[in-house]
């Protein structure tokens, strides 16, 4: 079950008034850091930048591949466990703007988890330990430990251990 907070707007879409919800200076700083860091080849340096400058909780030996796009409004709501791999061009969102509502919530990715290339993780999602998410999957609901998720709409199978 996705977990998020919601703020509604009755007369305009929330992106039109987003800087009433999130400071412009914070978003500007986050965009510069995230866009620059997407192209850093060193996993150690990238991990350090994300932890120190964006307050993302990243476990030991976790790798964030080339061109991963992190949420620009609330990157501090992202947690990644130890020894996990976030694949090429993955998008991790902690917010979503609908026509009349702005939602935001934490994204938690467990340990020993693989997120395949071009996957998109929506806000408020918890992905367990030892999970495999196939390339291109839109993660729209929680995935339990030892799960294998694939497709859009997403399907989940359990991995036998």
UniProtKB/Swiss-Prot annotation:
GO terms for molecular function: acyltransferase activity. InterPro entries: Hexapep, Hexapep_transf_CS, Hexapeptide_acetyltransf, Trimer_LpxA-like_sf. It holds the Pfam family Hexapep_2. The keyword Methyltransferase does not apply. Its EC number is 2.3.1.-. Gene3D superfamilies: Hexapeptide repeat proteins. Keywords: Acyltransferase, Repeat, Transferase. It is an enzyme of class 2 (transferase). Belongs to the transferase hexapeptide repeat family. This is Putative acetyltransferase SACOL0827.
């Amino acid at each position: 079950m996705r977990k998020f907070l919601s703020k509604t707007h009755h007369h305009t879409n929330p992106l039109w008034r987003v800087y009433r919800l999130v400071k412009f200076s914070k978003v500007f700083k986050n965009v510069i850091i995230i866009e620059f860091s997407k192209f850093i080849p060193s996993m150690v340096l990238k991990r350090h930048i994300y932890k120190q400058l964006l307050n993302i909780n990243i476990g030991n030996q976790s790798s964030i591949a080339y061109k991963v796009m992190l949420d620009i409004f609330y990157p501090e709501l992202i947690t990644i466990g130890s020894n996990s791999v976030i694949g090429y061009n993955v998008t991790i969102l902690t917010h979503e703007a609908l026509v009349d509502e702005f939602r935001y919530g934490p994204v938690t990715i467990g340990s020993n988890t693989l997120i395949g290339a071009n996957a998109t993780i929506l806000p408020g999602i918890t992905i367990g330990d030892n999970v495999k998410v196939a390339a291109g999957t839109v993660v729209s609901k929680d995935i339990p430990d030892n799960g294998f998720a694939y497709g859009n709409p997403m399907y989940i199978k359990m991995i036998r251990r």
